[in-house]
């Protein structure tokens, strides 16, 4: 009888701990939130990165109100602007 009560108590603790994980307001769910980006398509996007630095891309994005910009090799050296996170109320 004691073993049964101990077993049920253990199961109850495990089940309740799985359902009670807290999440943050800015990133609901689990894992790491990937950064939101807008990549400039076509020749304009590659032209901004053709100098070998991200300076032109960064200036392009900042002037247009984005949080920043970088050249990414996995998008064929395209300029990608970082979208600022939404403001929390």
Curated annotation (Swiss-Prot):
Cleaved signal peptide residues: 1-20
GO cellular component: extracellular region
Disulphides: 39-81, 49-71, 57-79, 61-80
Lineage: superkingdom: Eukaryota
Subcellular location: Secreted
Entry keyword set: Antimicrobial, Disulfide bond, Fungicide, Plant defense, Secreted, Signal
GO biological process: defense response to fungus; killing of cells of another organism
Family: Belongs to the DEFL family.
Record-given protein name: Defensin-like protein 108
Gene that this sequence comes from: LCR51
């Amino acid at each position: 009888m004691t073993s049964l009560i101990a077993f049920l108590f253990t199961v109850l603790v495990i089940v309740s701990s799985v359902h009670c994980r807290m999440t943050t307001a800015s990133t609901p769910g689990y894992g790491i939130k990937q950064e939101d980006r807008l990549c400039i398509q076509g020749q304009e996007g590659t032209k901004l990165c053709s100098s070998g630095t991200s300076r032109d891309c960064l200036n392009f994005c900042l002037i247009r109100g984005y949080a920043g910009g970088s050249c990414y090799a996995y998008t064929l050296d395209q300029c990608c602007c970082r979208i600022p996170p939404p403001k929390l109320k």
